[in-house]
């Protein structure tokens, strides 16, 4: 929840990619900071007054951190008054909410645990922090976290939540409890489903007067009982007996960081009845409640799950030519880690898509990992006031250019090499962009199949290639000669749809070249335009020259 807790992470800037300041003159720094400040204030007002949210919790948190970092770069630009919720809450907490220190990794957790005893782990439930006050066995107050000292009076709404205990007995009859109101889920797997904007949804239900029936979706996870029993097991037993079942079910003793890591992975990948964004490790013995204050909870720490996405700044826009001759746009990003991958660029796609997304240098992109760990753009979450977008080069290449190497063809030529060595074409083991660049620099190739004629000695002479690797590489190139004919024409770039491939496996070059447009249209997935492209491809002089050269190399089918 946007509850003022993000400031606890500001001490981590030194280890973050966010520590790099924008290369802006002071006037622009003031302008950009003012705009982002105003937007965050507007989002916060909507969130706290209406329970609405135009952006996800993750994006809000990361842009808030970005604003704080910019302020460090350009001090004195705007008043720093948006780090706490709007000052509408006037209900004072009997015991302050401390917040929780966030640890970056397993090493940090191990260091924090050192010399501590009576440690317990809980999932870091993602919802709305709340104080519940019981007097003489009755729920007399429910207070939103607010700034940790004061919050919104939510008592009337809390009494409408069916899952919330309204009556307590014994030691809980006069107690102060702190916990998380959460949206009850059925088998939520965090790794797959992510955060689902759970915080905003809970806040919305608590702040809308017309949502009484929907409050049945809410439950509570009690994570603190200030001045309660000192023994954690007894504490959880009493909470469970009173109807607060989740904290007892999901609180476990730990003594080693390996156990913490195991629970973290287990809860990240397993079905849970709530959304969570990490784990909390806490000491069983806590200071007296009167000593609690915001930002001073030294007896507990959080280790969050790896983020599903990151907000990253665009550092530059580059254009490259793909194997089809189409201009591709790549955004160079501030380097950040996403899952276990260091991400520093993302493929935007065509010039048309780049223009539609309106991405400029300095903009903030939400980046996640698609299949096989490939970065992708989820959204443009913030655009700078001053737009900086390079002019794309004129298009002068197409699907039939750059089979032969020339200085102006270097990008498309390299793209063709990368394609032909991929699993979708000739599947040359261990060969990719870096190796093709090295080979081309040492032994300039005339055309895209010239590597077939390289000797072992030539490959071994390439910088970075050892004698053993050169021998292995030559062997890989030699094995490729036995690939089926259809793989070779795919490597050349034959524009045939997947559905028609099976009917071409028994063909050879001469049979393909002899086909008319009508014969091509008879194949699955081939229409009039594609048939025309296929005939043009097979009769293009450069393609014909490559086919003749492959025939001289005794490649099957040529």
UniProtKB/Swiss-Prot annotation:
Enzyme Commission no? 6.5.1.2
Q: Which reaction does it catalyse?
A: NAD(+) + (deoxyribonucleotide)n-3'-hydroxyl + 5'-phospho-(deoxyribonucleotide)m = (deoxyribonucleotide)n+m + AMP + beta-nicotinamide D-nucleotide
Named from the GO MF annotations, one term is: DNA ligase (NAD+) activity
Q: Could you tell me the keywords of this UniProt record? A: DNA damage, DNA repair, DNA replication, Ligase, NAD
Spell out the catalytic residues. Answer: 124
Which SMART domains does the record associate with it? LIGANc
Quote the InterPro entries the UniProt record gives: DNA_ligase_B, DNAligase_adenylation, DNAligase_N, NA-bd_OB-fold, NAD_dep_DNA_ligaseB, NAD_DNA_ligase_OB, RuvA_2-like
NAD as a keyword of this entry, yes or no, is yes
Determine if DNA repair is one of this entry's keywords: yes
Q: Which Gene3D superfamilies match?
A: 5' to 3' exonuclease, C-terminal subdomain, DNA ligase/mRNA capping enzyme, Helix hairpin bin, Nucleic acid-binding proteins
Pfam families, sorted: DNA_ligase_aden, DNA_ligase_OB
Q: Which enzyme class?
A: ligase
Any one Gene Ontology biological process term? Answer: DNA repair
- Family per record: Belongs to the NAD-dependent DNA ligase family. LigB subfamily.
Q: What does the protein in this record do?
A: Catalyzes the formation of phosphodiester linkages between 5'-phosphoryl and 3'-hydroxyl groups in double-stranded DNA using NAD as a coenzyme and as the energy source for the reaction.
* Record-given protein name: DNA ligase B
Query: What's the source species' lineage?
Result: Bacteria, Pseudomonadati, Pseudomonadota, Gammaproteobacteria, Enterobacterales
């Amino acid at each position: 929840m946007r509850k003022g807790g993000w400031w606890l992470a500001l001490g981590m800037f030194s280890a973050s990619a966010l520590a790099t300041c924008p290369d802006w003159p002071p006037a622009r720094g003031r302008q950009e900071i003012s705009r982002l400040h105003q937007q965050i204030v507007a989002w916060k007002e909507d969130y706290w007054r209406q329970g609405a949210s135009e952006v996800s919790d993750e994006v809000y948190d990361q842009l808030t951190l970005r604003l704080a970092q910019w302020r460090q770069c350009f001090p004195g630009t705007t008043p720093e008054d948006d780090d706490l919720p709007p000052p509408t809450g006037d209900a004072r907490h009997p015991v302050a909410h401390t917040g929780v220190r966030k640890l970056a990794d397993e090493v940090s957790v191990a260091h924090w645990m050192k010399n501590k005893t009576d440690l317990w782990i809980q999932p870091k439930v993602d919802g709305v922090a709340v104080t519940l006050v019981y007097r003489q066995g009755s729920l007399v107050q429910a207070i939103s976290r607010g700034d940790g000292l004061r919050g919104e009076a939510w008592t009337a709404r809390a009494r409408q939540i069916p899952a919330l205990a309204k009556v307590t007995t014994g030691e809980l009859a006069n107690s102060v409890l702190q916990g998380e109101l959460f949206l009850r889920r059925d088998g939520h797997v965090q790794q797959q489903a992510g955060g689902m904007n759970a915080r905003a949804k809970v806040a919305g239900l608590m702040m809308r007067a017309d949502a009484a029936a929907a409050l049945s979706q809410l439950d509570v996870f009690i994570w603190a009982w200030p001045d309660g029993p000192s023994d954690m097991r007894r504490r959880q037993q009493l909470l469970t007996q009173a109807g607060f079942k989740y904290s007892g079910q999901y609180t476990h003793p730990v003594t080693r960081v390996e156990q913490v890591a195991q629970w973290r992975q287990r809860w990240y990948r397993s079905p849970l009845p709530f959304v969570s964004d990490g784990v909390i490790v806490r000491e069983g013995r806590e200071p007296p409640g009167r000593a609690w204050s915001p930002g001073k909870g030294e007896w507990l720490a959080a280790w969050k799950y790896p983020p599903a996405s990151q907000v990253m700044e665009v550092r530059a826009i580059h254009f490259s030519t793909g194997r089809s001759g189409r201009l591709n746009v790549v955004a160079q990003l501030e380097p950040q880690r996403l899952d276990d991958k260091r991400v520093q660029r993302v493929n935007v796609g065509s010039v048309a898509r780049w223009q539609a997304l309106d991405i400029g240098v300095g903009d903030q992109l939400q980046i996640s990992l698609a299949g096989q760990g490939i970065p992708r753009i989820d959204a443009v979450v913030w655009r700078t006031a001053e737009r900086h977008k390079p002019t794309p080069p004129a298009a002068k290449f197409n699907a039939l250019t750059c089979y032969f190497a020339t200085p102006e063809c270097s990008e498309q030529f390299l793209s063709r090499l990368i394609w032909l060595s991929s699993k979708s074409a000739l599947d040359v083991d261990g060969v990719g962009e870096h190796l093709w660049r090295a080979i081309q620099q040492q032994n300039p190739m005339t055309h895209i199949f010239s590597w077939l004629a390289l000797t072992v000695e030539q490959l071994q002479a390439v910088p970075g290639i050892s004698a053993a690797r050169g021998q292995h590489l030559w062997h890989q190139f030699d094995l490729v000669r036995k690939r089926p004919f259809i793989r070779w024409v795919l490597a050349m770039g034959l524009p045939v749809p997947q559905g028609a491939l099976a009917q071409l496996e028994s063909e050879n070059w001469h049979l393909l070249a002899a086909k008319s447009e009508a014969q091509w249209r008879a194949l699955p997935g081939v229409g009039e335009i594609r048939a025309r492209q296929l005939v043009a491809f097979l009769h293009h002089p450069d393609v014909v020259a490559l086919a003749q050269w492959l025939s001289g190399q005794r490649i099957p089918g040529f």
